[in-house]
Design a protein with these regions (language model features):
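C-terminal motif of bacterial Sec signal peptides marking the signal peptidase cleavage site
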Residues: 15-18
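Sec-dependent N-terminal signal peptides
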Residues: 1-9
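A gly/proline- and charged-residue-enriched helix-loop-helix capping module
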Residues: 133-150
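Hydrophobic alpha-helical segments, principally membrane-spanning helices and signal/leader peptides
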Residues: 2-3, 142, 249
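N-terminal secretory/targeting leader peptides
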Residues: 20-136, 154, 159-377
């Protein structure tokens, strides 16, 4: 337990800052970490239920389980959260309401599923041609991003903590090669996200909705010509390369992503401070772990799918990429002009970029990285 707490306190220096300056972060520092339950018999035994938008065995669900495991470890087993995969307690599209109403105490989600309630939730879960996973991480922990989550979920009687940050998705997997916008215009494609759907419509691309569980069969039967799911390791888990060998990358429609845990505010307020600290610390540790673990698995799956499974990577020309980029920004600016909540989140993201982009440009290849080629040997 001592070693875990030392690691937890170290991870806690990542911090979860509030909106505004990093100095006003309210981060989980060593003083707060000491308030985590360290085996005190004075603290109550608490049991929660945690639903999920993810199915059993899905990598995202394993992250939900890891979060719950950490909460239990940090409280010496006095606070336990039992995980239930999608469909066990409720359908994925019911989870938000179940947590909001207190039917269950918490739920693991991806905010884009709640875009029908408010499009601001989509920005909290992914962006088109904008934030990378590392951008999300820095924005949430240092740039005031966490407060945007609290503000939005707080409107629905919830508090929220990110527990998993994803890097850019794989791209579109298709049964025919995609090398241009024109190619996509002649296809029926599964694409997630309200904003991505609007951008696709402006680009003349025919988008359809297909459940992730039906994606393999839909591609196999020709119901759709292409589709996206997630990052390489998640795509590999569905074996999409067996029915769609072409792989158009990068994923302009989802350049990074965030999963988290929704917590009913009444249930949260009933917890002793030590258990609230344990939840926050578990979320910080889980986010840090998954940021590297998930990308490492993507490295391995990409190599496998290209070298063993015969996937063929295609790219579009720069003019088409520029058209897509400009269209994505146009969609965002239009939504920000008509949705105050969306604008609140979008403005915070733009403030972050204003701070980050100057130094990012100076770093060039030495910032987010580059690949060695023959000229570098």
């Amino acid at each position: 337990m001592a070693s875990l707490l030392c690691g937890a306190i170290g991870a806690a220096t990542l911090g979860l800052s509030g909106c505004g300056s990093a100095a006003d972060s309210g981060m989980m520092d060593a003083a707060n970490a000491n308030a985590v339950a360290g085996g005190s018999s004075d603290l109550p035994v608490v049991t929660w239920k945690m639903g999920s938008t993810w199915g059993d065995g899905n990598i995202h669900f394993t992250c939900d389980e890891r979060f719950s495991e950490l909460v239990s470890q940090l409280t010496d087993g006095r606070f336990t959260i039992t995980n239930y995969p999608e469909g066990s307690l409720c359908a994925a599209n019911q989870l938000f309401d179940y947590v909001q109403n207190g039917t269950i105490q918490c739920g693991g989600d991806w905010g884009g599923y709640w875009s029908g309630k408010d499009t601001a939730f989509e920005l909290l879960s992914t962006t088109m041609d904008n934030f990378t996973g590392m951008d999300y991480y820095i924005w949430i922990t240092q740039g005031g991003g966490l407060q945007c989550y609290q503000d939005m979920y707080g409107k629905y009687n919830m508090t929220y903590f990110p527990i998993m940050i994803n890097h850019a998705e794989s791209g579109i997997r298709s049964t025919r090669p995609i090398t241009s916008i024109k190619d996509m215009q002649s296809m029926k494609i599964r694409l997630g996200g309200v904003m991505a759907g609007r951008a696709a419509e402006k680009l003349g691309i025919n988008i359809t909705t297909v459940a992730a569980s039906e994606l393999y069969e839909s591609l196999q039967r020709g119901v759709i010509d292409g589709g996206e799911f997630s990052t390489p390791c998640s795509d590999d888990s569905l074996k999409l390369q067996e029915v769609a060998k072409y792989w158009c990358s990068p994923a302009w429609y989802q350049s990074g992503g965030v999963n988290g845990v929704m917590i009913n505010k009444d249930a949260w307020n009933q917890l002793p401070e030590e258990y609230q600290n344990a939840i926050q610390m578990a979320a910080e540790i889980c986010t840090s772990e998954q940021l590297s673990r998930y990308l490492w698995m993507d490295f391995e799956s990409t190599k496998k799918m290209l070298e063993e499974d015969g996937c063929i990577v295609t790219e579009m020309n720069q003019d088409d990429w520029n058209t897509i980029r400009n269209t994505c920004r146009e969609v965002y600016e239009e939504e920000a002009a008509q949705n105050e909540n969306f604008n609140m989140v979008y403005s915070s993201m733009k403030d972050y970029r204003e701070k980050a982009d100057t130094y990012r440009a100076m770093l060039g290849d030495y910032g987010w990285g580059f690949n060695y080629d023959d000229s570098a040997k």
